[in-house]
Amino acid sequence: MHVKKGDTVVVITGKDKGKKGKVLQVLPKKNRVIVEGVAMVTKHQKPNQQMQQGGRIEQEAAIDASNVMIWDKKANQGVRVGYKLENGKKVRVSKKTGEVID
């Protein structure tokens, strides 16, 4: 996958188009990601040991990985990701600026 946990991404399609957030979780088997503050859904929670109160909770839902692009601070926009070998290691590279992402 082109995104990793901790990356800053921008949503390129859907109701949250244009929103930026940090990747909280990557689900590679389903090709989905959970992004902070994006695709918020309301979940009804029963009272339990951790949450005595119960009630309705807002939390992030998973969105398809193809709907996000890595945010490049230098280019100040979402960029596509390429890969290249550097010192025998595969690294992610911004297609726009050519800089190593990780």
Swiss-Prot record:
SUPFAM superfamilies: Translation proteins SH3-like domain. Keywords: Ribonucleoprotein, Ribosomal protein, RNA-binding, rRNA-binding. One of its GO terms (biological process) is translation. One of its GO terms (cellular component) is ribosome. HAMAP family: Ribosomal_uL24_B (MF_01326_B). One of two assembly initiator proteins, it binds directly to the 5'-end of the 23S rRNA, where it nucleates assembly of the 50S subunit. This is Large ribosomal subunit protein uL24. It comes from Alkaliphilus oremlandii (strain OhILAs).
